[in-house]
């Protein structure tokens, strides 16, 4: 029995990927990809880009016993300056605060989730759509999701200056907003069952 050391990105994060073939498809369809020849599931990731951007992950249990998994669609959204951006639509939702020991639950009381030099790393219990309002770029990014009981919100704050995967100051230019099904809201599939996690992004001008 093999064992993986799991990090916050899940067991697929450090798996080896192989380009087996490439083909330009009219509708942008991506063929399904199994984890391994002996896999007990099939995962298909579809991306449709036009006036809106839709991403969906469909997992099918191809095995003979129930399977459980967690998933999140990792959307890193560009902002002009994170200090002048706010995420609206989560007011009244409970969230787990991953910046504190034990992930204590908190209540989102302000209308907007705001960002600055302190890190924000939260799992919101909400299936609602949200809006990322960006005063610097003068736009609103609408995030509409389905099959997702949670929304993950992350920005490393000033700690991002010391991350290996980013240059100093880059943390000011993005917010991660992720449709998720994780922790106690993960997905359990009976044999033959499937689940689709999806989100659609659209952009409009911000009305001041």
Task: Report the location of each language-model feature.
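Extended, loop-rich substrate-binding clefts of extracytoplasmic carbohydrate-active enzymes
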Residues: 1-50
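Acidic/His-leaning functional-site neighborhoods
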Residues: 2, 114-189
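Asparagine-centered strand-capping/turn motif at beta-strand->loop junctions
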Residues: 57-63, 155, 203
